């Protein structure tokens, strides 16, 4: 059995490689429950709910720490009791395996918090 996505580390993506094909993205999507493909399979997105603003902010801060540790950064929007996280690799204008690694890490972080 291969290593779970949330246990993997992002690999540097310098651009010049093609983004994942839809079929490749859909295969990895099975390993990231709750996430959806958006923008014609060019972005990975998930919304989370929380008990209040403070918990949503704590989650967003945690995602920020993960992003800095891995050198891969999402788009995040949040407000009272909710947050939406989107992953894509800007250098290739689409999805890379790193996006799925980070989605799995994001889900693991959220699972460790009591959501709303």
From Swiss-Prot:
InterPro entries: PCD_sf, Pterin-4-alpha-carb_dehyd, Pterin_deHydtase. GO terms for molecular function: 4-alpha-hydroxytetrahydrobiopterin dehydratase activity. One of its GO terms (biological process) is tetrahydrobiopterin biosynthetic process. Its EC number is 4.2.1.96. It comes from the Bacteria. Keywords: Lyase. SUPFAM superfamilies: PCD-like. It catalyses: (4aS,6R)-4a-hydroxy-L-erythro-5,6,7,8-tetrahydrobiopterin = (6R)-L-erythro-6,7-dihydrobiopterin + H2O. Belongs to the pterin-4-alpha-carbinolamine dehydratase family. HAMAP family: Pterin_4_alpha. This is Putative pterin-4-alpha-carbinolamine dehydratase 1.
């Amino acid at each position: 059995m291969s290593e779970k996505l949330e246990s993997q580390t992002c690999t540097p993506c310098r651009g010049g490689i093609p983004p994942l094909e839809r079929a490749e993205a859909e295969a990895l999507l099975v390993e990231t429950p709750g996430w959806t493909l958006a923008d014609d399979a060019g972005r990975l997105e998930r919304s989370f709910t929380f008990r209040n603003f403070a918990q949503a902010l704590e989650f967003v801060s945690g995602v920020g720490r993960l992003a800095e540790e891995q050198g891969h950064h999402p788009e995040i929007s949040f407000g009272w009791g909710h947050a939406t996280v989107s992953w894509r690799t800007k250098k290739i204008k689409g999805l890379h395996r790193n996006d799925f690694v980070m989605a799995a890490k994001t889900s693991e972080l959220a699972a460790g918090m009591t959501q709303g």
